[in-house]
Structures are given as structure tokens and as C-alpha cells.
């Protein structure tokens, strides 16, 4: 099936990535406890990536960069902790439950607990501002236009929530809206049941939608995408990851299918380095670097059980929920 374009034209300028990542050697430095600065216990060179690691809280499953510091959802502890760019632990909030998905904006950080349908709002010092319910089984959240946007595939909705935690609008979106991302002007949500991407502007108006292919023939193989695992917008493309078939689909900003890139199967996480898409595969313990045009630059075996990835402009950051570490990936030209 050929993907259809936008039914109503959406802005084509999408969120820009930051930083350019080109890595050439690896050194793994892991501290012996949650504090930074532990003794070097691993030094295994692996070509093409430079890395350092620090111990963090139990079962880190989500990481974001808010422009100044890193925030990690430590699901096993029921905490959210901020970290400096040298790996130092800064502040910790006990939010309870199982925080897993994070978003930031307007000086706040929000932690989504999909198990109990709640979001905890934190200030920049990790003080709990408020906690509120957002849906039945919320799956993703982003912050845009002074509002938090939360997708809920069970309820088939996207909620627009004010900074004060009040429900400003409830939009019914398709059947099962799940993975969510944003551009500077709109929120984009993908529905794996209807194979649809829907755009919502900051006023809460649905401004357009398109369908992505339900079957793609490449060579002798036919690919059926299945349920989206992750979704990310970059300056010239939309990327939808399908962990079940081990593929990342590239779409133009207007919604036209422009290719598939093979990656390992299983849970996947995405980040943009400035000119490459970084795909973390949990089951394969790899990072696959993909160019802006969809070709594989290189695949790196990083070991462990990586769960999420973020980028700060100079470094990539990956969490590992088995080793309970935060791993920093640094471009070689930036290493002293």
C-alpha cells in the first residue's frame, strides 16, 4: 500500500536535532556505586565508540536532556533523578510507582507512570510540584505550547494538560494513539491500529493526517510494519520504529514513504545526533547509526541491556536497566 500524503497540509519544518556525533574508540568506565567517581573497573576497547559509564538508580528506563541536565526515570526505585553532564548525581525526587517516560518544558519535568495512569510534575530542583491522573493507560508524553500532551491508546485519545495539571482538552484520535513526538509547531501521534499519523497544533486542533504503508515489498521480502515501538521527528523526516520486524521506516515531512532501514528486533529507542538517527536495540544491545537519508552508517555492539537514549549536543546518553548505569557516548574529536 502506498502511503498517502497529508489530507490537510502541515508545516514541513520539524524539530531540529542538535550536535553531530562521530565516534571512533571505546573505553567503558563504571563507578562502583550510585556516586560519581568510582574506580575504573572495566576497560575493554571496542572500535568506533568512546564511552564512559556511571552507576545510577535501579532499573533506569527513561532519559531526557532538558537543555541543562539529564533526567533519569529510575523505575525500580520509584524515583526521578537529575544528573550533570559529568555524570554527577544532582537531585532526586521520590515520585512513587514506576516512572518510565519523561518530558520537559517551561522549567518543569514530567514523569509518566503508565501503570497507574498518573503524571508527576517536578521543578528544576526535583521538588514534587503536583501529581495528577492523565488517563487509563497513558503511553507517551511531550511538552509543546505551554501544555503537556499525553497519548492514551486504551482510551483512544490525546490529552492537552495545562502546566497547573488541569485537563484543557481531550481529543479522540483514531483507535490506538501511542508513540508521540513533536515539531516546533505541532504534536504528532502515530496509531498502529489505523496506520495513521495525526498532527495537532498548539491550539488543540487536528490539522492533518496521513496513512503509512501497511505492507512494503523490498526485494524478495514483504514487510508488514505491525505496532510502532518509537516515533521521532527530525528536520527532514519522520521516523517510525517497528521492533517486531526490526525496521525503521522513514517518511517525508508530508507523509510520503521513503524507505526502510533494517535494525535488530525487539524494543527500540530513538535519538537524533544532528545528522544521524541513533537507534538503541534493547535485545541486541546495539546502537545503529542511520544517516539522514536512511542508510546505515555503522552498528555498534555496546553490551548490557540498553533501554533509552538522549543527546545533549555533544554526547549521546544511554541507560542500561540491568547494569543500572548511565553511559555517555562522546565524539572522538571532543575527547581531550
List the model feature ranges, each with a label.
Residues 5, 9, 13, 17, ...:
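Predominantly soluble domains enriched in secretory-pathway, periplasmic, or organellar proteins
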Amino acid at each position: 500500500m502506498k502511503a498517502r500524503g497529508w489530507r490537510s497540509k502541515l508545516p514541513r519544518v520539524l524539530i531540529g536535532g542538535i550536535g553531530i556525533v562521530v565516534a571512533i574508540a571505546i573505553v567503558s568506565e563504571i563507578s562502583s556505586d550510585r556516586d560519581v567517581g568510582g574506580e575504573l573497573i572495566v576497560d575493554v576497547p571496542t572500535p568506533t565508540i568512546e564511552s564512559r559509564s556511571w552507576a545510577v538508580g535501579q532499573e533506569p528506563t527513561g532519559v531526557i536532556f532538558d537543555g541543562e541536565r539529564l533526567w533519569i526515570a529510575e523505575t525500580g526505585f520509584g524515583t526521578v533523578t537529575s544528573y550533570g553532564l559529568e555524570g554527577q548525581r544532582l537531585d532526586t525526587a521520590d515520585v512513587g510507582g514506576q516512572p518510565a517516560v519523561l518530558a520537559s518544558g517551561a522549567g518543569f519535568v514530567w514523569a509518566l507512570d503508565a501503570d497507574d495512569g498518573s503524571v508527576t510534575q517536578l521543578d528544576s530542583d526535583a521538588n514534587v510540584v503536583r501529581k495528577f491522573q492523565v488517563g487509563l493507560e497513558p503511553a507517551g508524553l511531550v511538552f509543546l505550547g505551554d501544555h503537556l500532551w499525553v497519548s492514551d491508546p486504551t482510551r483512544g485519545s490525546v490529552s492537552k494538560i495545562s502546566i497547573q495539571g488541569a485537563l484543557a482538552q481531550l481529543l479522540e484520535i483514531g483507535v490506538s494513539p501511542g508513540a508521540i513526538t513533536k515539531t516546533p509547531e505541532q504534536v504528532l501521534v502515530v496509531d498502529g491500529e489505523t496506520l495513521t499519523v495525526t498532527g495537532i497544533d498548539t491550539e488543540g486542533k487536528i490539522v492533518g493526517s496521513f496513512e503509512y504503508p501497511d505492507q512494503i515489498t523490498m526485494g524478495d521480502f514483504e514487510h508488514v510494519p505491525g505496532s510502532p515501538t518509537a516515533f521521532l521527528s527530525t528536520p527532514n523526516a519522520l521516523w517510525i520504529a517497528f521492533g517486531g520486524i526490526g525496521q525503521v521506516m522513514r517518511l517525508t515531512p508530508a507523509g510520503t514513504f521513503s524507505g526502510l532501514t533494517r535494525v535488530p528486533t525487539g524494543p527500540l529507542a530513538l535519538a537524533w545526533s544532528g545528522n544521524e538517527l541513533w537507534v538503541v536495540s534493547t535485545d541486541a544491545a546495539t546502537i545503529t547509526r542511520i544517516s539522514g537519508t536512511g542508510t546505515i552508517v555503522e552498528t555498534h555492539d555496546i553490551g548490557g541491556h540498553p533501554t533509552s537514549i538522549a543527546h545533549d549536543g555533544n554526547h549521546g546518553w544511554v541507560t542500561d536497566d540491568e547494569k543500572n548505569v548511565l553511559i555517555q557516548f562522546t565524539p572522538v574529536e571532543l575527547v581531550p
